[in-house]
């Protein structure tokens, strides 16, 4: 009975696809009436359909697996990571397990005022990648090859190569590396915008070092954001089994095309519970193409600080529904200021496309090339206004790079982070995401979870402002005013230059 029920369910959903060779019941040419098959014929047909879908998955696995590689990243000699301390601030256990990546674990495992991170030697980082050209370009996650000393790549046939880094983009957690080889099997990208909830999804990777593991699931959701994994989020959610070691591997459609790059999971134990996230192929390809051609990513810049719209704000600003993004600040001299955008404008559409979320708008602007003209539809004092803006290149992050050299990673403080930290939503400062053990920052006592309030005696409330201050401090020590809870202190980061 269970077998028959399974067959019926499958035959009324998946197997109506012409790709799988399903044919509807035949009609009598003289009467036009559908002729029902006997029960034995129906059962035989259903078994054939099950075999057909099995062959479909097998075909994808056979064709795609040779293009998937096993990556081992051996960090630089002496490189250390900060062990994640216990959760002491009343937070719920962080559900996002970033494939044993200390950077992400530290993001939520914040130390208490009295705790200092305990340095420990880093082990090799192991993950997955996939080949995108016959001459050896390989895509993976940034966190798989971060702080790389030596990168080993093992092909499906067992051949091993040493890889070099071509380009890194931590803002999307993507990276491109290259091996010296020719005539390699490679994967092609599909269109992630065409995905529908319930479509098949196939993940290939190396979970726990078990190479060439294939798992199958469906697309559970699209457009997942505000997960605080990376700066630019538009994740595909899938229930295809993804575990530590799958990071950087491909998520495929039933045609064997890459529709996403597997990046993170939700887990209370570190293992699979049915919720995984992949970077959509359209976003990934834009980044990957630039990394291959230029070694870096150029992003569009509007020059506004945004806040998500909730039901209360929607009512306050007289929106007909909950959508759009609220401008809380306009950067001086930015394209937004020059175009006439104001604080408290609500951006509800760009180039005629409705703004579903703050993240969707940020992603769209960032993917625009400098010089692109975009028409923004805003709500101002209850009225709709269209404002054309020409985006420019996002300002060089010299300041952030200088800070990273001193061992600190930062990001803008968002309302969501404020909520997790128990801070007021209008708190100003820059959030310390991670600190490299043994770095000048670690020696000075900077720890993840602190807020940077001022740099060289100048108040800062955004990464853009931090950049401006640090651009004028090249080669000099940096004085930071940092806070953690109610404790404020000053620390000096010593420059190596």
UniProtKB/Swiss-Prot annotation:
Class of enzymatic activity (EC top level): hydrolase
Signal peptide span: 1-16
EC numbers for this chain: 3.4.21.107
Region Serine protease, residue ranges: 128-289
Biological-process GO terms, alphabetical: proteolysis
Residues involved in substrate binding: 245-247, 302-306
Cystine crosslinks: none
Domain PDZ: from-to ranges: 290-381, 394-485
InterPro entries: PDZ, PDZ_6, PDZ_sf, Pept_S1C_Do, Peptidase_S1_PA, Peptidase_S1C
Catalysed reaction equations from the record: Acts on substrates that are at least partially unfolded. The cleavage site P1 residue is normally between a pair of hydrophobic residues, such as Val-|-Val
Keywords: Hydrolase, Periplasm, Protease, Repeat, Serine protease, Signal, Stress response
Role of this protein: Might be efficient in the degradation of transiently denatured and unfolded proteins which accumulate in the periplasm following stress conditions.
NCBIfam families in UniProt: degP_htrA_DO (TIGR02037)
Family note: Belongs to the peptidase S1C family.
Protein name according to UniProt: Probable periplasmic serine endoprotease DegP-like
Higher taxonomy: Bacteria, Pseudomonadati, Chlamydiota, Chlamydiia, Chlamydiales
């Amino acid at each position: 009975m269970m077998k028959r029920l399974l067959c019926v369910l499958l035959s009324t959903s998946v197997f109506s696809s012409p790709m799988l060779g399903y044919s509807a019941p035949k009609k009598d040419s003289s009467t036009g009436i559908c002729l029902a098959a006997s029960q034995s014929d129906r059962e035989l047909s259903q078994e054939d359909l099950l075999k057909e879908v099995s062959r479909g998955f097998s075909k994808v696995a056979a064709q795609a697996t040779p293009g998937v590689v096993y990556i081992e990243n051996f960090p630089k000699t002496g490189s250390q990571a900060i062990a994640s301390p216990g959760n002491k601030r009343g937070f719920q256990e962080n559900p996002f397990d970033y494939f044993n990546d200390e950077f992400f674990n530290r993001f939520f495992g914040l130390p208490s005022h009295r705790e200092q991170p305990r340095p420990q030697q880093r082990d090799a980082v192991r993950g997955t990648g996939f080949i995108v050209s016959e001459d050896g370009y390989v895509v993976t996650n940034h966190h798989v090859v971060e702080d790389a000393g030596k990168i080993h790549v093992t092909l499906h046939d067992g051949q091993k190569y040493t890889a070099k880094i071509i380009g890194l983009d931590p803002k999307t957690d993507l990276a491109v590396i290259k091996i010296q080889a020719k005539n390699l099997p490679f994967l092609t990208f599909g269109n992630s915008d065409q995905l529908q909830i319930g479509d098949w999804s196939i993940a290939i990777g190396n979970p726990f070092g078990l190479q060439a593991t294939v798992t199958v699931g469906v697309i559970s959701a699209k457009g997942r954001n505000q997960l605080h994994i990376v700066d630019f989020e538009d994740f595909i959610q899938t229930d295809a089994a993804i575990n530590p070691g799958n990071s950087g591997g491909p998520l495929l459609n039933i045609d064997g095309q890459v529709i996403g790059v597997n990046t993170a999971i939700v887990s209370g134990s570190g293992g699979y519970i049915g919720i995984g996230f992949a970077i959509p192929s359209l976003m990934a390809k834009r980044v990957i193409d630039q990394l291959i051609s230029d070694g870096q990513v150029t992003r569009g810049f509007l020059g506004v600080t945004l806040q998500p719209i909730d039901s209360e704000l929607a009512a306050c600003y007289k929106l007909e529904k909950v959508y759009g993004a609220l401008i809380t600040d306009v950067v001086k001299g930015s394209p937004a200021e020059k175009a006439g955008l104001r604080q408290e404008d609500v951006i509800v559409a760009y180039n005629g496309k409705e703004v579903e979320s703050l993240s969707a708008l940020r992603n769209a602007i960032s993917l625009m090339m400098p010089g692109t003209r975009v028409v923004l539809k805003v709500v101002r004092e209850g009225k709709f206004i269209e404002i054309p803006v020409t985006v420019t290149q996002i300002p060089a992050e010299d300041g952030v790079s200088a800070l990273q050299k001193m061992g600190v990673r930062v990001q803008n403080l968002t309302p969501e982070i404020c909520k997790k930290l128990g801070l007021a939503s209008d708190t100003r400062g820059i959030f310390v995401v991670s600190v490299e053990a043994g770095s000048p920052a670690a020696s000075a006592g900077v720890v993840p979870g602190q807020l940077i309030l001022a740099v060289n005696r100048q108040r800062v409330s955004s990464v853009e402002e931090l950049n401006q201050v640090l651009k004028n401090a090249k080669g000099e020590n940096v004085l930071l005013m940092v806070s953690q809870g109610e404790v404020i202190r000053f620390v000096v980061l010593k420059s190596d230059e």
